[in-house]
Structures are given as structure tokens and as C-alpha cells.
Amino acid sequence: MKVLVPVKRLIDYNVKARVKSDGSGVDLANVKMSMNPFDEIAVEEAIRLKEKGQAEEIIAVSIGVKQAAETLRTALAMGADRAILVVAADDVQQDIEPLAVAKILAAVARAEGTELIIAGKQAIDNDMNATGQMLAAILGWAQATFASKVEIEGAKAKVTREVDGGLQTIAVSLPAVVTADLRLNEPRYASLPNIMKAKKKPLDEKTAADYGVDVAPRLEVVSVREPEGRKAGIKVGSVDELVGKLKEAGVI
């Protein structure tokens, strides 16, 4: 079974993002970039399936700028077998929209004969949480989102999901799309020997045009702004003073 894992290059989650002065977006100049954390979890899960003998090959795919090759090398160092970089933008500020990403991934999955796609549930830069669902719809495959546990049983995948008030376990027929939640696993660190080996693993470069997909944006970002700072609180000396302050604020 071939497993396809999409990975996205974005601002490292330890870095505090800065909004551009004109409010047009996030400033990516001289900022450390890394793999989307949910995608790291997806890569790890694919590797674990291979270690169990349930996957034959893991293909990592990234869609965006050429610099995303670094992100793919990370996936290869973790344990992916080969990678495909689909160059769909020249400007690092351009974020390829979920629908275009889903269309490209669907084309890659068909070309590669993939039976399982494991993706992060969302990217932490835009929090769209849409690509996996769109991808399943385009392919006409079953989908299991927000997975906290994945088990392959013959021609089916049994997926446990966290829902309000408990856990839900569903079984989906393969081929399928699974999106990874935070509690699915703890991703491994790539060892130095594996980082060196990753440089020799295949990394093919394609373009969106190779798959016949138009990546022109359909959404317009009107403005981006940082969250408002939290106002300092005050200490009150008595219950009466607290009640008075609440009345002043119009709470009671």
C-alpha cells in the first residue's frame, strides 16, 4: 500500500509572527520556517504503518515555493521514501488555497496509485481545516478526520476520533483520506545519519500546470491584524468594591 502525506512549509510554531505594517499579511522576511506540526504527525503515522508492514512506500508531497524542498527533506529524514515538490508559486507570501491544493493532491494520488492519504487536520498559519475534506470529495474516497488513533484492518481503516464528550471510532473502506489530530502520536526527531541519507532520496519537481490545476487565488485577504493586547486587571479589597466595579462595567 502506498501512503501519500502532504506537508506544508510555514512559520515555525516557536516564532512569534509579525503582521506587515500595511496589514496585507504576515511578514515572512528572515523568519525561521519549518513543517506544519500536524503534518509532522501525519508523516510519523505513515512511518509507523510501514514499520508494522502495512505500508510499502511513503510519498511526501509539498505544494508551494521551491524553498519547500527543505521541508520535504525533513520528511525524508524522518522516514519517507521519496518526495514530490509541486512548484505553484514564486512568491513566498503567496499561500495556495485549499481547493487548489486538494486538486493537485488528487492528481498526484491518481498518478501514484495511492491507497491512503494521511494529512494534518489543518495548517497552523491559516487554520482552514478544509484541504483533507475537499480532497476526499474530489477523489470520491471515504474520509476520517481528526484522527487520534489509526488501525489498518485488511481493506479498511479503523479510526478513533475525539468528539465532544468522548471518543468515536469509525471504519472506512480504503482508499481513504485521514486527517491527523494532535494526540495521534509524538513525531520522532530525524537523526543525523538519516538527515544525510535524506539528501540522496528521490525528490521530483513538478509544477501545478503539469497536473492541469489553476492556482490563481479565489479569495482576497482584506486585512490582517494582530490580536488586541489584554488590558491590565485591578485588585479589589472587598466584596462590596467588587460588586461596585461590576456595576460600573455594566455586567450586573
Curated annotation (Swiss-Prot):
The keyword RNA-binding appears for this protein: no
Keyword tags: Electron transport, FAD, Flavoprotein, Transport
Cysteine pairs bridged by disulfides in the record: none
Needed cofactors: FAD; AMP
Entry-linked Pfam families: ETF
Cofactor: record remark: Binds 1 FAD per dimer. Binds 1 AMP per subunit.
Record bears the keyword Transport: yes
GO molecular function ontology, one term from the record: electron transfer activity
Record-linked Gene3D superfamilies: HUPs (3.40.50.620)
Function: The electron transfer flavoprotein serves as a specific electron acceptor for other dehydrogenases. It transfers the electrons to the main respiratory chain via ETF-ubiquinone oxidoreductase (ETF dehydrogenase).
Family under the similarity heading: Belongs to the ETF beta-subunit/FixA family.
Quaternary state and interactors: Heterodimer of an alpha and a beta subunit.
Name listed for the protein in its UniProt record: Electron transfer flavoprotein subunit beta
Native source organism of the sequence: Paracoccus denitrificans
Encoding gene (name): etfB
